[in-house]
């Protein structure tokens, strides 16, 4: 008994696949055609201008023969008064030509303030420009120092602020001080750069008054003096005695403000500190008095480096030693080479039993 099996075959679907691929190919071929510009009977968007804008609201499209009327922006005015500024959509779907038809308005010309000056930052008074105000020496500015040309009521332009004024710089009398006075104390007001000088009164006691601080004050601003007033007080320092030392210069029975003394130590003692001291405003020596100590002198703290080879110190000595060693080494090498060459120049021949000495140059 025989059994035969016939293999089953899958149904063929190639025609359907080919049809699907064909449709996709047609889509790819037709897609670029959809992107091609189509002819239209309308003009594109109208051009933009810096000084002008369209009147009203723009339409989505304009047909040939239609026009757009322009007007000036705020702060601008027509170059030619009465001229109609318009664009026309032409038959070829392009706009007619139109130039900028407006220009910037100008603010009123400003005069220099009394005792001052107005500076045109942009070199003109056109819309959007600015000016700066400055006062002459001895005067201060009252008001706003910068003004801008901007849109005012309606379509006009004007300056943003009123012009300032330049007022004379004056100072009130400077402060009075105890035990002292200043010049021109009878005046109620002082002008710019005017100077007053302070001085101390005579003392009723055994010690005189010292003027501590600036003796001259200058009116530098509106109600402002150059510095604080000085003081008149007794400034007296004690006798600058140091153990194992003496005064070199600046001797005096009393030592008042800014008295200067030079000190030195006795033989065998060294000075630690400053040799020159000054009587300060707090009745103390500045800097403090030095000390004289027996023994070796103190190390210099701020000695300047000497000039020449001495300033090089140990580094210079090391360089000299290295240079000498290198020189000796070179001489030894030359000597060894010379001896080796002499040995190469002597040889013996077996035929004549002679020694020929050859000298190599």
From Swiss-Prot:
Keywords linked to the UniProt accession: Complement pathway, Cytoplasmic vesicle, Disulfide bond, Fertilization, Glycoprotein, Immunity, Innate immunity, Membrane, Phosphoprotein, Repeat, Signal, Sushi, Transmembrane, Transmembrane helix
Major site of localization recorded for this protein: membrane
Record: glycosylation sites: 122, 145, 301
Topological domain ranges for the Extracellular compartment: 43-311
Disulfide-bond pairs as recorded: 107-149, 135-166, 171-219, 200-232, 237-279, 265-292
SMART domains in alphabetical order: CCP (SM00032)
Highest taxon listed in the record's lineage: Eukaryota
Residue ranges of the TM segments: 312-332
Modification note: N-glycosylated.
Membrane topology reported for the UniProt record: Single-pass type I membrane protein
Tissue occurrence: Highly expressed at the blood-brain barrier. Broadly expressed, with highest levels in thymus and spleen (at protein level).
Location relative to the cell: Cytoplasmic vesicle, Secretory vesicle, Acrosome inner membrane
GO BP annotation list: complement activation, classical pathway; innate immune response; negative regulation of complement activation, classical pathway; single fertilization; T cell mediated immunity
Stretches assigned to the Sushi domain: 43-104, 105-168, 169-234, 235-294
Signal peptide range in chain numbering: 1-42
InterPro entries: CD46, Sushi/SCR/CCP_sf, Sushi_SCR_CCP_dom
Residue intervals annotated with topology Cytoplasmic: 333-361
Gene Ontology CC annotations of this record: cell surface; extracellular space; inner acrosomal membrane; plasma membrane
Quaternary structure and interacting proteins, as annotated: Interacts with C3b. Interacts with C4b. Interacts with moesin/MSN.
Protein's job: Acts as a cofactor for complement factor I, a serine protease which protects autologous cells against complement-mediated injury by cleaving C3b and C4b deposited on host tissue. May be involved in the fusion of the spermatozoa with the oocyte during fertilization. May act as a costimulatory factor for T-cells which induces the differentiation of CD4+ into T-regulatory 1 cells. T-regulatory 1 cells suppress immune responses by secreting interleukin-10, and therefore are thought to prevent autoimmunity.
Domain notes: Sushi domains 3 and 4 are the most important for interaction with C3b and C4b.
Name used for this protein in its record: Membrane cofactor protein
Native species: Bos taurus (Bovine)
Gene name as annotated: CD46
């Amino acid at each position: 008994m025989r059994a035969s099996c016939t293999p089953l075959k899958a149904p063929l679907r190639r025609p359907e696949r080919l049809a699907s691929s064909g449709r996709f190919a047609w889509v790819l071929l037709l897609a670029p055609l959809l992107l091609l510009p189509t002819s239209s009977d309308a003009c594109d968007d109208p051009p933009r201008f810096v000084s002008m804008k369209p009147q009203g609201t723009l339409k989505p499209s304009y047909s040939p023969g239609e026009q757009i009327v322009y007007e000036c922006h705020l702060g601008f005015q027509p170059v030619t008064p009465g001229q109609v500024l318009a664009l026309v959509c032409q038959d070829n779907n392009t706009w007619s030509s139109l130039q900028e038809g407006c220009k910037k308005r100008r603010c009123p010309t400003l005069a220099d303030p009394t005792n001052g000056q107005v500076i045109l930052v942009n070199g003109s008074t056109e819309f959007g420009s600015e000016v700066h105000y400055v006062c002459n020496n001895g005067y201060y500015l009252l008001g706003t120092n910068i003004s801008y040309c901007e849109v005012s009521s309606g379509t006009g332009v004007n300056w943003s602020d009123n012009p300032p004024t330049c007022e004379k710089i004056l100072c009130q009398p400077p402060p009075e001080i105890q035990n002292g006075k200043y010049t021109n104390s009878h005046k109620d007001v002082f002008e710019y750069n005017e100077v007053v000088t302070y001085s101390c009164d005579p003392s009723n006691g055994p010690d005189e008054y010292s003027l501590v601080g600036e003796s001259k004050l200058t009116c530098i601003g509106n109600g402002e003096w150059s510095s604080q007033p000085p003081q008149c007080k007794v400034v007296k320092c004690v006798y600058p005695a140091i153990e194992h030392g003496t005064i070199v210069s600046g001797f005096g029975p009393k030592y008042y403000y800014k008295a200067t003394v030079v000190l030195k130590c006795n033989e065998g003692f060294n000075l630690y500190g400053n040799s020159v001291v000054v009587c300060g405003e707090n009745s103390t020596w500045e800097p403090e008095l030095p000390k004289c100590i027996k023994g070796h002198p103190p190390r210099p703290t701020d000695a300047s480096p000497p000039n020449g080879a001495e300033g090089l110190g140990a580094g210079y000595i090391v360089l000299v030693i290295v240079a000498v060693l290198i020189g000796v080494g070179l001489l030894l090498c030359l000597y060894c080479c010379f001896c080796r060459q002499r040995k190469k120049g002597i040889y013996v021949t077996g035929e004549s039993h002679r020694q020929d000495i050859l000298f190599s140059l």
